[in-house]
Amino acid sequence: PLTEDQIHAGRPHVSNFGYAYAKRMLDVQSRAYRQQYGCNFITAVPNNLFGPNDNYDLNNSHVIPAIMRKMHEAKVNNKNVVLWGDGTPLREFTYSKDLADILLFLLEHYDEPEPINIGNTKEYSIKEVAEMIAEITGFTGEIVWDILKPSGQHRKPSDGSRLVELGWKQKDYKDLRKSLTETYKWVILKYPNLRGIV
């Protein structure tokens, strides 16, 4: 798992190049402001986020909103869903409402220049998540895995032990299925007026 002291080590995976460097530069900027101006900035490094108000643009959204939108539209139009890769890569997912709770927790419990990994460190395969979203959305068509498209890095585990040492507990995370269900209820309420569609 990626520990906080490894954030700047080596080149990021090509599939995550820009995003990884952006996280690194935010850490540099946070430390510089802390050092030069005495700002109590911290660098909280999340993993894969999802939830209401996410970006549902199929060209640049994260995996959960992309799958959720594809399955919703396929269900409505009675079509199959094509997903990239083979579905085997493992990812950690954190609900946006959990992220908000963690950030409030950090305001009271963390004031250090070193970055801190935040987010649920339980791993799920993309296939598991897709099947869960299919059940939640009521999608009954076929999920076609396009193995000619990239699957991405197989794993991107993060070490959340520093957050745990501060008192955050695994039980403080909302259940993935419940969080996906809440998110889909929001999608139904807002569709088609979702960010990335309109």
Predicted regions located by residue number:
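Catalytic helix-loop patch of NAD(P)-dependent Rossmann-fold dehydrogenases
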Residues: P1-T43, N48-F50, D54-N59
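Aromatic/hydrophobic pocket-lining residues that form π-stacking "cages" and hydrophobic walls in ligand
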Residues: S30, K70, A130
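Conserved sequence/active-site signature of Rossmann-fold short-chain dehydrogenase/reductase
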Residues: L49-G51, V63, L99
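C-terminal substrate-binding subdomain of Rossmann-fold SDR/epimerase-dehydratase oxidoreductases
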Residues: E73-V198
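Short acidic-hydrophobic sequence patches enriched in Asp/Glu that either
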Residues: N59-V63, S125
